[in-house]
Structures are given as C-alpha cells and as structure tokens.
UniProtKB/Swiss-Prot annotation:
The gene is Eps8l2. One of its GO terms (molecular function) is guanyl-nucleotide exchange factor activity. GO terms for cellular component: centrosome; cytosol; protein-containing complex; ruffle; ruffle membrane; stereocilium bundle; stereocilium tip. InterPro entries: EPS8-like, EPS8_2nd, EPS8_PTB, Eps8_SH3, PH-like_dom_sf, PTB, PTB/PI_dom, SAM/pointed_sf. Pfam families: EPS8_2nd (PF22975), PTB (PF08416), SAM_3 (PF18016), SH3_1 (PF00018). Residues 495-554 form the SH3 domain. PROSITE patterns: PID, SH3. Disruption phenotype: Mutant animal have a progressive and severe hearing loss at young adulthood. The generation of receptor potentials in hair cells at lower sound pressure is impaired, which leads to a reduction in auditory nerve responses. It is found in: Cytoplasm; Cell projection, Stereocilium. Detected in fetal kidney, adrenal gland, salivary gland, stomach, gut, cartilage and skin. Detected in adult ovary, placenta, skin, adrenal gland, salivary gland, kidney, intestine and stomach. Expressed at the tips of cochlear hair cells stereocilia. It comes from Mus musculus (Mouse). This is Epidermal growth factor receptor kinase substrate 8-like protein 2. The keyword Zinc does not apply. Its main location: cytoplasm.
C-alpha cells in the first residue's frame, strides 16, 4: 500500500517539529547569528557519527498493485504529488553512524526510525526534478517486511550529494570491513564549516501573496487578487471624524498592505487545515500498518507516521482561531476593494475550515476562549449579511467573543492588540494593525450611575459619543452635583487632571494626529486605547500612540500649567436640555434653529468690526538637528546624540553617512544595535517620511509657481488696453 503525505500550498516555514510546506530553507527574520547557531546544532560531525537536518517528504511501499514496481515509478509518483501540491514536508534529523541510520525528532531528539545498515538496500540523489532541488532517496527492507519501503528526504541545509556519500561510505565500511568513512567525514566536516562561515543572510521574508498567478495552485482561487483602484469620488473606506481624508496614494498603499496581511492569514489557516488533514491521514495509515501485527514492536516507517499523526497543541489551535477572526475583520474592511475572489466568497472559505477545526477540537470551548482580536461592528454586520444558515449556527455557537463587536465590549479589562506571527517570518507593519482613533467604534454602554468622573470625561470626549442620538440626557455626563457650566472654569475636578510625558519624537501623518517632541508634557483628553488624544500647551489637540507616553511626575508638569495652584483646562461646550416646547415638534425646532443662526451671524458681523487682537503664544523651541541624504558622519553622530541613543549606538552608527544609514533595514539595525535597533529604525522612518514630505512640498511649490507664470504670461498676451486684466472670451 502506498504511504504518502501531503503538503500545504502556502509558503513559509514551520517551527519545531511542525511540517514545512515548501522547499525553501527556513530563513526567519531572526539574527544571522541565530541562523548559524541553528545550522551548526542541526548539522554536526563527531567521530563516526554525523547528523543532518532534512525534511521527510514521503514513504512509498514498492508494490505493483500501487503502480510502484521500481525506484523510477516512486520518483514519478512523488513528482506527480508535488505538482498537485500534495507533499507535506516533515522536519527531522538524519543521523548516520557505523551501525545504522536513525531519524530523530527535531525538538525532543526522540528516535523515530532506526534502519540498521544491512536493511539499507539502495541510496541515490534526485536533483532538480521537483520543487525540492536536492532530494535523497533510500530503499530499506526489514527482515519482517515482504516489500521494501522507499523514503524521500529533502536535504535543505546540506546537499543531498554529501549526505549520500556519507551513507555510501558507511555501507562500504560495513560490507567490506574497511575504514574509508573517517576520510569522507573529514572532507564533509570542512565543507560544512565553510558553509557555516558564509551562510547567507535571510532572504526578504515579506511575501507578496497577491502576485501569485491564478494557475499556480488549486487553492489560488482562495487568494485575494490585486486590490481595486481607489475611486476618485470615494473619500476613503475608513470612517473619519476629520474632513481631511487620506490621499488616494496613501489609501491605496494601506489597502495593499491589508490585502497582503489577509493573504498571509489565509495561507496560515490553509496550512493549519492541511496539517490536520494530513495528521488524520497519517493516523489512518498508522493503524493500517499495525493491523494484523502480532508483535507490539514498532514497525518500519511507523515512527515518522506517529510524528505526522501528532495533533497540534492548544496554542496552535488558538493561533488559528485568532487568524480566522483577523481575516473576518479584514474581509469586512476590504469588501469594496478586493476581487477574484470577492470578500463574500472568501467568508465561506473561512467557515468551512473553521467547522473542521472545531470538530477536531471536540467542542467550541477553545474558540470561545479567544477574545483578541475582537470583531468590528462592520465585521459583525458583514457576517450577518453573508452567512448561510449552517454557517450562522456555527458562528452563534462560538459565543459573545465572536458575536459581540468591540464597540460593545467593556472598557475594562482591555482586550490587547493582536499582532499575528506568520509562518513565513514576515512581520506586518504595526501601523496597519494598530487601531487608528477614527476606526475605534467607542466604548461599551455603561449605566450612568456606574460612571466615575474619569469615565464620564472619557465618554464625553469619545468621537462616537459626542453627537449621541440616544435618550441620554446631556447633563448626565457631568459629574454629580455639578452645574451645566461647572467645567468651563480653570479648576476642574482633580480626577480629571492627567498629564503625560513624551518619550520619543512623533511626527503627525494626518490632521487627526499630533506632532510631539521628546520630554514634552501634554494634557490627556482621551486614554485607554492604543492612541491617546492629547492637548499641548498651545491648545492643539490630536492623537498620539500610547507606546511613546509615560506618566508625568509633578515636577515634569512645571509652573506654566500650575500657576497659583490652578491647572488650565480649555472650556468645555455648555450643555443644555432641549426646551419642552420644541420636544417632538420638528418644524418649531427648525424655526428656532434658524433664529439662533441669524443671531450668530449678527454676532459674527459685529465681532469682525472690532479691532483685531493679536494673541502671541510662547512655544518652546525644539532642538532640530537635520539628517538628510547628504549628511556626513559628523551630522549622523550629532543626530543620534540628539535622539538620546546610547553611546554604543552612537559609536557603531556614527561612522556612517546619511545615505548609508537610511539604507539599513530593520533587521540589519537589530544586528548592530540589539534591542535599540527597532527604535533607530522607527526614528529613521519618521525622518525619511519628513524628508519626502519636504521634498514633495518643494516640488509642488515649483509646479504651482510654474503654472502661475504660465497663467500670467497667457493673461498678458490676451489682455486689451481698454480692459486691462480681463482676458478675452
């Protein structure tokens, strides 16, 4: 009977003893030194024992009834399975000594298979015939077996030719009684040492899933194609409180990033489902091999099948459920922008595997325990509008962590931000995953008698509650016992006073965000999420990411905001009840509002006739040390010192020029700077964006100046002496 295993079609690498679905060596985004350490630990030669990291692809029984009468037949079958993406690569360690070949579990080092040298009948390499370029083939037959097994291994770190030479030298020594193998191992050891010293850096881990051609795999239909172009008339697919919308290019870039995240998420879900299916298949094959056996002794190939049949851990199930929820959120967000397949088609692709995974778990309990990420209101509405009855029943069985949108979720305890880890090693940009303030749908409804003064302030300033149409009396938002105008003065309730100190510079990227400088102290208007709304001393307000904030101490707040023991708070809008005379009378209300508007217009006209008052606001002058693409090492060093990086970082990076520093990616900076590498990369990204914005602004000014000159030239040429300044029509 044929024994084979299959593989997921998604790219990537697995961790530990998990299967791998491609022929690419596992090159994660980790440190180069970690790669070398892993390589040296997996591929070793000591005395007469050698060890190689390989991937078990398949095991076939040489059986004419299975159309496998020879080694060539087995190779053809493997090529056929590989072309249909039905090969599942399982990481193992292949150990060769003077008595046997052993297969070990990568994680536990447990022995999976033991092939005594007399049972190894044949070995050969299969090069460049599959998507796996370097394959080792072994034919083994135990004394208890009627038919031999043919095993295939992908040699992903040491070439198959070297491994085969090692095995053949061990077989020759065993059969002929010679000692030729030590010399072979000596040459191999030198080659492995050379390879370790020149091990290449990791390839770029960021996949571009939507560039896959539709015919590449049977599962290509479950991948999102290129995003639809952003219509000129569409202001953006995010709800915003500001009238300033994202530029079309920025919006298109964001949609592209989110499409990429969606495709990576679908890849990982698909890989997990394929792994479950292959585990079930391996379990079935294992039982068939054990059938009819009188001895309890482990038979040939049963060790690898046992490893393949091992179910995923609970943590891996949780990870898959989290990615399913993330995919649902992204489908709802991108439903107007993706095609071939559409979001409505992909949601059915998600719920089919979800049903299989929950059945594998035995109950929906694990799925119910997964709260992060919460579904958005749009996602919940999207599911209600597209699920068929069977899928709706499954969804409802998962409970409120799947059905209750984040806008209705309690503020405390706060559900953490979900940052997925993909098998490919690609790290999604945090700015895409982090909820921007205009995407947050507000807080859960809390009874008014449970609102503390602090909570009341947060609710009041929440964008989604500022224009509430609910039957909540406006004055109920104010602290108990206060008058409607109690918050207009300069002495607010102590619980309302909160200041934070800025740890790093932050440059606003749109009208909703606020640019801040390191060590600046700002007043908190809204908190509790990834973005906090702050107000600076100049009265400007906007959103700032909370990971660059620290609680301000009393001495940090300083005198300007605390003169005479009084803390300044901007006047809040007065609250008024609707006069009873207008309640329920729409026409009267409109007439009243017209009168109010007329009154306001008169006041505004009167104000315009008054002498203009020039208010001058003192601002702290930031220390600005430019870093450009023309900067030399001295300017780079000064910029690093101004950003308060450690002396080691200044010493290591201060020898570079501006272009050299800008050319380093995040992983390269981490290798040089350690933990501070991420912050260096973040500061460089902000600086690069500032330079690009500055350059685009100057280019725009040149273009506008050129247009004005052209218009002036045209006007002067077409202006008559009698009507100077008026162009002829």
């Amino acid at each position: 009977m044929s024994q084979s295993a299959s593989m997921s079609c998604c790219p990537g690498a697995a961790n530990g003893s998990l299967g791998r679905s491609d022929g690419v060596p596992r090159m994660s985004a980790k440190d180069l030194f970690e790669q070398r350490k892993k390589y040296s630990n997996s591929n070793v030669i000591m005395h007469e024992t050698s060890q190689y990291h390989v991937q078990h692809l398949a095991t076939f029984i040489m059986d004419k009834s299975e159309a496998i009468a020879s080694v060539d037949d087995a190779i053809r079958k493997l090529v056929q399975l590989s072309s249909k993406e039905k090969v599942w690569a399982q990481e193992v360690l292949l150990q060769v000594n003077d008595k046997s070949l052993r297969l070990l579990d990568v994680e536990s080092q447990e022995e999976l298979e033991n092939f005594p040298l007399p049972t190894v009948q044949h070995s050969q390499t299969v090069l460049n015939q599959l998507r796996y370029p370097s394959v080792l083939l072994l034919v083994c037959q135990d004394s208890d077996q009627n038919k031999p097994d043919i095993h295939f291994f992908h040699c992903d770190e040491v070439e198959a030719e070297l491994v085969q030479e090692d095995i053949e030298s061990a077989l020759a020594d065993y059969r002929l009684g010679k000692k030729m193998r030590p010399q072979t191992l000596k040459g191999h050891q030198e080659k492995i040492r050379q390879r370790q010293s020149i091990l290449p850096p990791p390839q770029s881990p960021a996949p571009i899933p939507f560039q896959r051609q539709p015919g590449d795999s049977p599962q290509a239909k479950n991948r999102v194609g290129l995003p639809l172009p952003v219509p000129f008339s569409e202001p953006g697919y995010r709800r915003r409180e500001s009238q300033d919308e994202e530029p079309r290019a920025v919006l298109a870039q964001r949609i592209e990033k989110e499409t990429q995240i969606l495709n990576c998420t679908l890849d990982d879900i698909e890989w997990f489902v394929a792994r479950l299916q292959k585990a079930a298949e391996a379990f079935k094959q294992l039982n068939q091999r054990k059938k009819g056996k009188k001895k309890n002794k482990k038979g040939p190939a049963e060790g690898v099948l046992t490893l393949r049949a091992r179910p995923p851990s609970e943590g891996e199930f949780v990870d898959c459920f989290q990615k399913t929820k993330l995919a649902i959120n992204l489908l709802a967000k991108l439903q107007k922008h993706i095609q071939n397949p559409s979001a409505a088609e992909l949601v059915h692709f998600l719920f089919g595997p979800l049903d299989l995974i929950i059945n594998t778990c035995g109950s929906p309990d694990i799925a119910r325990s997964v709260s992060s990420p919460l579904l958005s209101t749009d996602a919940v509405s999207f599911l209600r509008g597209h699920l068929v009855p069977k899928e709706m029943t499954l969804w409802e069985s998962l409970g409120e962590t799947w059905m209750r949108p984040r806008s209705e979720w309690p503020r405390e305890p706060q559900v953490p931000l979900y940052v997925p880890k993909f098998r490919s090693g690609w790290e999604p940009p945090l700015d895409v995953l982090q909820e921007a303030p205009w995407e947050v749908e507000g807080l859960a409804s809390v009874p008014s008698d449970q609102l503390t003064p602090k909570n009341r302030l947060s609710v009041r300033h929440s964008p989604k509650h500022s224009l509430s149409s609910e039957s909540q009396a406006p004055e109920d938002i104010a602290p108990p016992g206060s008058s409607p105008h109690a918050n207009r003065g300069y002495q607010p309730t102590p619980a309302m006073t909160k200041y934070v100190k800025i740890l790093y510079d932050f440059t606003a990227r749109n009208a909703n965000e606020l640019s801040v400088l390191k060590d600046e102290v700002l007043e908190v208007l809204e908190d509790g999420r990834q973005w906090w709304k702050l107000r600076n001393r100049s009265g400007q307000a906007g959103y700032v990411p909370c990971n660059i904030l620290a609680e301000a101490r009393q001495e940090d707040v300083g005198a300007p905001l605390e003169q005479s023991g009084q803390k300044y708070w901007g006047p809040a809008s007065p609250t008024h009840k609707l006069p009873p005379i207008f309640a329920g009378n729409k026409e009267e209300l409109i007439h009243h509002m017209d009168e109010v508007n007329d009154e306001l217009m008169k006041k505004i006209s009167h104000i315009k006739t008054q002498p203009q008052r020039n208010f001058r606001v003192e601002r702290s002058q930031p220390v600005h040390l430019p870093l450009t693409f023309e900067s030399g090492p001295d300017e780079v060093r000064a910029w690093l010192e101004a950003k308060a990086f450690s002396a080691r970082i200044v010493e290591n990076l201060g020898i570079l020029t501006g272009p050299q520093l800008f050319s380093l990616n995040k992983e390269e900076l981490k290798k040089v700077c350690g933990e501070e590498g991420s912050r260096v990369y973040s500061q460089l990204t902000v600086q690069k964006a500032f330079l690009e914005k500055q350059q685009s602004g100057s280019e725009l000014e040149k273009l506008m100046s050129k247009i004005r000159r052209a218009e002036d030239s045209y006007t002067s040429q077409h202006t008559s002496p009698e009507s100077e300044g008026a162009p002829h029509l």
